[in-house]
């Protein structure tokens, strides 16, 4: 049961040199995010003295993320007013305007307005300087470098006053005399903050905004068109608020530090985001935490740009691949995930609309979801974790996927999930991908001999799968919640599949209804703590299957997405000796007596067709199961 081959290209340039007068360590940069708040507060709590922002192998700790008072927009009435133009020639305290360049050489607040038809703003201040650039209506085009270039300072704040409209456009990358590559229209070698409520429009020949240290955004309307990446904070990206639109050939928002495991992460607590990319939408080299915000994301041309076998059809958002020419080597394969992290990916809030060619939510380690709303269409997996997937809350609707949820270890203790998949609905480290037409573009291959686990202890899970509904290469245990599965109509898969070599399907609590064909039937183990009944029943796609208990009360009702011939039901109120009654669209089909822990089952192993009836035809693609909660 080999799964998909992961093909990820990490293409990031690391600057190894800096100005001698502005040399700084990563430790200096880290202090920016952990300093005591000056003149402001945070909703995330008090700084813990000496606590790391991210452990070497851990998740982002929200209690250590803070925004200083100066990161938040404030009045600029005490600033130095500067008017720029191609012919301007002036000097003042801390600045010079000459030859189409504004050079800032001292700390302070500078209120800038005007236009350079081919020029730039340069910040080259002492390494301890805090420089605030208030863009009060600037229009800067630069053909030879970055329209705004921060060479040296301690920190630079770009403020966007209310009602201001500002534009930056560059034509090409450039290189400083020390070899430093300038890759963004707004490029900073130091910590950078952006705040305010005004507008900043960027048209970039490569990246839109780059900080080689920490990048913070607490406000502003930011619109970026980039030939490569939209927003890059090498050490970390911290976003509190703002309205951000990114259209990028590369990635949307990313943190890239791969040298220090405590850096390279993304934290977002609010804002409105519209991100369209050929690459990844939001990418953290290490970990990611999103606790709020509204996200509209499209990657790689969207899920429609991937065939059922997972191959790109070509003509992505920026036409990266010609039709029919899927890259076959990792060197040419582009990662087009919506949310991607190298370690932990924590989602504790927010609203997400995702249309991705690659995985919608992906990490090389652990995904944890405990809140938020997710509307997902993807050409690959809805949620993929190489190691652990933990879902304890939130509302997840996966309208289209290759596989809905996938990880080596899966733990579901809460939340609502409605999953539609062309292969397995939920897969714990295994299952056949049914891919006979060549490798899919993005494949995540699991070792089927690894120890895996799959436990559902709460929540509501509704699955409509063309492959296995729920597939575990180890044991499957349901001890709580509601689980309804519309399995495949073909005989090569089942509504449940478990691992070989003595693994079992254990019903220890909760409510379970599996519906499909009998070709690969797996029923709950006789070692289960809760009774189950398996029997034949025929119904067409879209019909309602309901089961009533011995007292005539309805135990479960489920609108089944595809034609079916077999069902398995388990409920705390089904006792040995009870008779359950089965209805299809309100018409009584049969009465079945529960005679054992697994009535009609096969001790949790693989069942044969054994008189269960022939499998039905294929249901329509893309139908979502709709579960009716037990009464």
Residue ranges, per PLM feature:
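N-terminal secretory signal peptides that target proteins for export/translocation
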Residues: 1-2
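A composition-driven surface/loop motif
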Residues: 5-631
């Amino acid at each position: 049961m080999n799964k998909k081959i992961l093909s990820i290209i990490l293409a990031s340039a690391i600057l190894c040199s800096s100005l001698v007068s502005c040399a700084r360590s990563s430790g200096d940069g880290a202090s920016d995010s952990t300093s005591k708040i000056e003149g402001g507060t945070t909703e995330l709590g008090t700084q813990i003295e000496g606590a790391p922002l991210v452990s070497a192998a851990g998740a982002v700790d929200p209690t250590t993320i803070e925004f200083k008072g100066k990161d938040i927009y404030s009045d600029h009435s005490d600033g130095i007013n500067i008017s720029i133009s191609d012919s301007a020639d002036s000097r003042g305290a801390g600045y010079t305007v000459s030859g189409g360049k504004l050079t800032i050489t001292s700390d302070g607040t500078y209120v800038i307005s005007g236009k350079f038809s081919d020029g730039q703003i340069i910040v080259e201040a002492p390494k301890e300087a805090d420089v605030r650039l208030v863009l009060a209506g600037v229009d800067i085009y630069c053909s030879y470098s970055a329209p705004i270039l921060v060479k040296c300072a301690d920190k630079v704040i770009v403020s966007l006053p209310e009602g201001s409209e500002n534009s930056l456009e560059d034509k090409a990358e450039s290189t400083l005399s020390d070899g430093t590559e300038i890759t963004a229209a707004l490029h900073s070698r130091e910590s950078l903050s952006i705040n305010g409520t005004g507008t900043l429009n960027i048209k970039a020949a490569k990246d839109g905004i780059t900080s080689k240290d920490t990048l913070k955004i607490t406000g502003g309307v930011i619109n970026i068109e980039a030939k490569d990446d939209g927003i890059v904070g090498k050490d970390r990206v911290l976003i509190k608020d703002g309205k951000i639109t990114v259209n990028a050939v590369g990635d949307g928002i990313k943190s890239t530090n791969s040298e220090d495991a405590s850096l390279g992460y993304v934290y977002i607590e609010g804002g409105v985001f519209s991100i369209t990319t050929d690459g990844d939408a939001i990418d953290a080299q290490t970990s990611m935490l999103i606790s709020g915000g509204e996200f509209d994301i499209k990657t790689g041309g969207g899920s429609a740009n991937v065939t059922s076998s997972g191959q790109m059809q070509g003509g992505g958002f920026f036409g990266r691949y010609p039709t029919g020419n899927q890259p076959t080597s990792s060197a040419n394969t582009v990662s087009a995930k919506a949310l991607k992290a190298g370690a932990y990916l924590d989602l504790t809030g927010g609203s997400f609309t995702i249309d991705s060619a690659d995985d919608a939510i992906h990490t090389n380690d652990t995904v944890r979801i405990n809140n938020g709303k997710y509307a997902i269409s993807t050409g690959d997996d809805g949620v993929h974790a190489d190691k652990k997937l933990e879902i304890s809350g939130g509302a997840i609707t996966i309208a289209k996927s290759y596989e809905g949820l996938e990880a080596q270890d899966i733990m579901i203790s809460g939340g609502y999930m409605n999953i539609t998949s062309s292969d397995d609905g939920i897969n714990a480290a295994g299952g056949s991908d049914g891919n006979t037409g060549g490798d899919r573009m993005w494949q995540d291959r699991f070792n089927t001999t690894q120890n895996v686990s799959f436990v559902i202890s709460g929540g509501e899970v509704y699955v409509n799968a063309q492959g296995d509904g729920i597939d575990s290469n180890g044991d499957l245990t349901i001890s709580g919640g509601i689980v309804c599965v519309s399995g495949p109509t073909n005989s090569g898969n089942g509504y449940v599949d478990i691992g070989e070599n003595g693994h079992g399907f254990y019903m220890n609590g909760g409510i379970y209804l599996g519906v499909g064909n009998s070709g690969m039937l797996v029923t709950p183990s006789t070692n289960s703590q809760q009774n189950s009944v398996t029997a034949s029943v025929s119904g067409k796609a879209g019909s309602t299957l309901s089961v009533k208990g011995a007292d005539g009360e309805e135990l479960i009702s489920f609108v089944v997405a595809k034609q079916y011939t077999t069902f398995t039901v388990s409920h705390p109120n089904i006792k040995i000796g009870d008779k359950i009654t089965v209805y299809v669209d309100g018409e009584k089909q049969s009465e079945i007596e529960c005679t054992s822990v697994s009535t009609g089952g096969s001790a949790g192993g693989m069942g044969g067709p054994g008189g269960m009836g022939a499998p039905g035809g294929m249901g329509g693609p893309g139908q979502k199961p709709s579960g009716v909660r037990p009464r």
